[in-house]
Amino acid sequence: MVEPNTRLEEPIVATQSAASLVNLRDLGGMPTTDGTTTAHGVLYRSDAPYPRDETPSTVPVWPPAAVLDLRAQVERDDVGHEWDQGSKLYHWPLYDRAAPISRDAPNLVDLYRNILEAVPHRVAAVVDVAATAEAPLLVHCAAGKDRTGITVAALLLAADVQPDAVMDDYLATAANMTALRNRWEAKGRNITVAEAWLLTPQDAIEFVLDEFLSWRGGPIGWLTDHGARPAAIDAWRSQIRPS
């Protein structure tokens, strides 16, 4: 099980102020395949927080009870944020090569393929956090788009959220990317990254969805085949899908 406060081995624009998170949203209200919707106040996604950020007003509860930080250690060292004692931090570096720090333009389909092929067990392991963490759980990386997008897609599909809704949620990030670049500049990040790091191509998320949906047993089969516990998946589903 992923333990908190340790570094582990192994639709909808939130806010456009550089003083706060710009790619934050609550993933409640998303339609499921059986006609229900996901619960509010359970799962958030966002870009990386910065010290002295303003409190966001677009989510029902803040700070989150739990935080799943998917960034590499070098990213955390560069941009550190100390959460209140009431927020449990799970540091789970997903895939260091997905850090948006390169001037070389990435092919995001290839990047997402590499993540799912190279570290599928690390994607599947996030179910343990989601199943046991107190809500709301915030999942974030640097931009809240690539590593976060894959992780959130896995969690939502495991809860039977409609694939089109998962895709639309990923694409909604596009509206926040200019604000994200402005935020990075306002926070004094002296990096120049290729514009492709801030794109949200539909074919990239379609590739991810197809990988999960076409797997034997669907998204749940993909997760269990890569190490997720069925009991954890059931517990997660009971949290995100109100009875």
Regions found by a protein language model. Give the residues of each.
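Cys-dependent protein tyrosine phosphatase-like superfamily
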Residues: M1-L138, T151-S243
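Ser/Thr-glycine-rich phosphate-binding loops at phosphate-binding pockets of nucleotides
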Residues: A143, R147-T148
